[in-house]
Amino acid sequence: SKSVMAVECDHALTQAESDKLCWLFGEATPESEENLKGHFVGPRREMITPWSTNAVEITQNMGLDGIIRIEEYFPVKDENADHDPMLQRMYKGLDQNVFTTNRQPEPIVHIEDLEAYNEKEGLALSKEEMDYLKKVEKDLGRPLTDSEVFGFAQINSEHCRHKIFGGTFIIDGVEQESSLFQMIKKTTQENPNKIISAYKDNVAFAEGPVIEQFAPADHSKPDYFQVKDIKSVISLKAETHNFPTTVEPFNGASTGTGGEIRDRMGGGKGSWPIAGTAVYMTSYPRTEEGRPWEEILPVRKWLYKTPEQILIKASNGASDFGNKFGQPLICGSVLTFEHKEKDEVYGYDKVIMLAGGVGYGTQRDCLKGTPEASNKVVVIGGDNYRIGLGGGSVSSVDTGRYSSGIELNAVQRANAEMQKRAYNVVRALCEEDNNPVVSIHD
């Protein structure tokens, strides 16, 4: 068979319920055996997939009650078949325990050797940062826990803090009066034109026209649509996702697009994405013969994927997320380059993947408010797993420094369906006459 569907329910299915499921699965045949032999690739027991969430919701809309989880498993030739170990696992046979998990939470670990833990987990902490953590340990009178050190590494990484761009530069012994970030911001400060917000939020906003908003009168219930004029702002956003796309092109580019869309959702007190773009830069892909300019350098042994594989898979990943989310990828560009100048060799061996896009919001919601002690903090989205953690710190060092396991784990995995659900909430709040959001962030 092409695939096997496993259904978890809280009661024995009636014949009518079983018939409905078979119809839903494309006239599938019920399996009479409780145990299936062979090798199968499917989702990890511990992780309910976005596909399952959607499938269960469809069964609820069909009037099928009591279905908890539905997952799909694919027969493979042997245990060496290719799969993503972060999201999938190899099953040697399928049985009634396919959804059973016996894992217990790992105990809190106190870190006795910060230097060793820093290298082991790929946290990219500098000597100064570790000296600071040791001072914190001394003040607390105890070693820091693994969660505390890991959390510090993420929020204090170069990816998040922009320590280089925001730092003080001393050139030839002379301290420079401006940081790189201050120099970048100077253009907008001296010539703001119609810029409303830049370099201080998830996205930049420029003044837009008065437009018609076509939206339900009340999002909390089924209601009639209405038209009203709103003063708009135009959002612009671009960011690179180089390290993840180098390591795992499909998910790297997919989550680059997804993260950039979230940034346009998280501007001010909420805003709307419209369309996206993508840029790819790699070394020569060597897809065809007869291109003498591509022979300027010998073919290297690539650490992860070849430039050809990266261009194909990254393009597929970026488009895949946009398609599933509902945002078209309308333009982009590709640059491939290698060069040798005397003994110097140049090339985009570490890939550039830039995701960008435009959107819009309301002038009412384009600036964040100041949170107060009495405000509520609300988190929406999917289940949390240890996926993509470490990306901010691992991407701050040279690709290939850490083990492939650490680097592959640091790449996020896309969940466009869940992101669209979160976006529906953000959009509903922004389209209401009174938006309760004070500040929003992804």
What are these regions (language model features)?
Residues 1-399, 404-437:
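Core nucleic-acid recognition elements
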